[in-house]
Amino acid sequence: KSSAASDVYKRQILCVPYTDLFYAWHTTEGTNIHIGAENMHWEEKGAYTGEVSGQMLKSIGVEYVIIGHSERREYFAETDETVNKKIKSALAHGLKPIVCVGETLEQREAGETEKVVTNQIAKAFEGIEASDLEKIIVAYEPIWAIGTGKTATSEDANNSCLLYTSDA
């Protein structure tokens, strides 16, 4: 791998709440730390009280945005379709999406990890240009390991990464 390619894997990204974005950007200016938002809305304009668009994020120096986090999916009823809209909007505004995928404990115990993660990736990336795939980071988020005392192994993460690589 070239040094440029390997640098991507060493990038430090700090994703903070909206209220801390400008402060984080200002504080880390001139460092190797990149700033990301924890969420965004896919529409650029409209009556979406409390939502922040990709254009707004970009205007204050944000480079990355988390999309599809399990908490957003669970508590705010985000779907694979809304994740797809957010990815497209992020890319259109020059942001680099960090797309979360992962399975619940029930899905894991039923042996459905591959099916669930593959489906999430396929729906999230529907209509995304191949040239844009390199701008997207996929984060394996094993939902079953959050607050359960169970931990994902490096093999779990590697297997999910292989699913992404083969789908892409």
Question: Language-model segments: which ranges?
Answer:
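Short, charged, surface-exposed secondary-structure boundary motifs
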Residues: 43-49
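Fold-independent oxyanion-binding glycine-rich loops
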Residues: 16-18, 37-40, 69-70, 101, ...
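Structural detector of well-ordered beta-strand residues that form the stable sheet scaffold
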Residues: 13-15, 36, 66, 98-100, ...
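Single conserved hydrophobic/aromatic residue that forms the stacking wall/gate
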Residues: 1-5, 9, 164-168
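Short linear Ser/Thr-Pro motifs
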Residues: 2-3, 31, 53, 70
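A short aromatic-anchored loop/beta-hairpin motif
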Residues: 6-39
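Expand to "…catalyze enediolate/carbanion chemistry for C-C bond making/breaking, isomerization
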Residues: 53, 58-62, 70-166
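Glycine-enriched alpha-helix->loop->beta-strand junction motifs that scaffold or abut catalytic
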Residues: 28-35, 61-64, 96
